Amino acid sequence: MFHVEKQSGDKEKDYQLLLKQLEAMTEDETDQIANYANASALLYHSLPEVNWAGFYFAKEEDGQLVLGPFQGLPACVRIPFGRGVCGTAYANGKVERIEDVNAFPGHIACDAASQSEIVLPIRVDGKIVGVLDIDSPVKNRFDEIDEKYLTQFAETLEKALAQ
């Protein structure tokens, strides 16, 4: 059985605990879908002020990202490469941290409550296979500390997926 720890109020300590929890969850599990599903649940239930956490996977033949495991309201199923925050992060291969999604050109509004967003590329064996997308109903929700630790979260997940 798994238990999600309560937030202590110390953001860095909370993220360090989150990383340990992810490592424990993925340590002996080789099924990718299970690991992505549990990772999205862990983020959704651990991070404050988050209304969506999940993954989109690249379908190269279609030029689109397709919805994967997530927590939150039903979401857009397909996002073209280079469109919206997710498609831009995938196309550029870098983190997109958006303080106000309404000011982002071409933002795709899957949930009208979302006000800020962070999207991180997910790589397996060096190749971008998709993105981790986290939304918040609060503007300016994600800062440098979030980006630092969520990048480590993605890297920890990538190691588990490479097994």
From Swiss-Prot:
Species: Bacillus subtilis (strain 168)
Coiled-coil parts of chain: none
Protein name: Protein YtsP
GO molecular function: L-methionine-(R)-S-oxide reductase activity
GO CC terms of this entry: cytosol
PANTHER family: FREE METHIONINE-R-SULFOXIDE REDUCTASE (PTHR21021:SF15), GAF/PUTATIVE CYTOSKELETAL PROTEIN (PTHR21021)
Highest taxon listed in the record's lineage: Bacteria
The family this protein is said to belong to: Belongs to the free Met sulfoxide reductase family.
